[in-house]
């Protein structure tokens, strides 16, 4: 990884939609970055976001890449591999919103390109940082079982990808982080399509080679917003409701129930951008969610969609 960069870094955002706007704002707030450029094929949208922050909108991605030191890619998921590859080949450290890509082959190519060009590749799995401040990622024993659900009403966003890649991929990453180096030996999947051309609601269950069991549900066509996780260990159970903000722990593990009072809990996106920037500047050993982790989540999501007949 190249750590010869100096602060402030010139930051650019590819994708001027909702999440592109969020990332642009985080670069404006970060003392180690200066937001410099916006690229979006929709020139009017790119110009609107650029005007909001007083920066330049580009209509050609090559010129955009010449104007920046680091890149966030927050364009539609199906474009992540192409845009990521262009930025990495230009020698730019890249933070790609989830999913890292939409196929395992694409994701692995991005990881290879980052290694080849010795630049940081990060993924937008910022909830890892929340688990860090909770203390969950510090537990050395893998859980016996994880159950998680992530549901919300239809928003009309991210219809280019399935709910597996849109929402469930977050919990896949978190679950793989806790379960560790183990393979999913069994997998069953159910899902339905209502509002898009891919899965809008899905559930999966898997058993891993270390005995851990995983059950996930994700929906973007639910009546209400629900998000929670139950992690079962031999020592007890951890129950988290991220909407109601409740936290129960019967395990005896030293965890932080006040995680929402931490900077990471209040602003996980900002914390993830900051960690990415610190990695580029050589102040951190790597991003919170490196490309390899994003690729692992993509490969699992791809397997789930294949099992659902997608």
Give the role of each language-model region:
Residues 1-53:
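N-terminal Rossmann-like dinucleotide-binding module
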Residues 1-4, 63, 70-73, 209, ...:
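C-terminal helix-rich "cap/oligomerization" subdomain common to oxidoreductases
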Residues 23, 42, 53-111:
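Beta-loop-alpha module in the N-terminal Rossmann-like domain of NAD(P)-dependent dehydrogenases
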Residues 59, 96, 121-123, 240:
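Hydrophobic residues in well-ordered beta-strands that form the structural core
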Residues 101-158:
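A contiguous active-site-proximal alpha/beta segment in oxidoreductase catalytic domains
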Residues 155-224, 292:
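Rossmann-like dinucleotide-binding domain that binds NAD(P)(H)
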Residues 194-195, 210-272:
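NAD(P)-dinucleotide binding in Rossmann-like oxidoreductases
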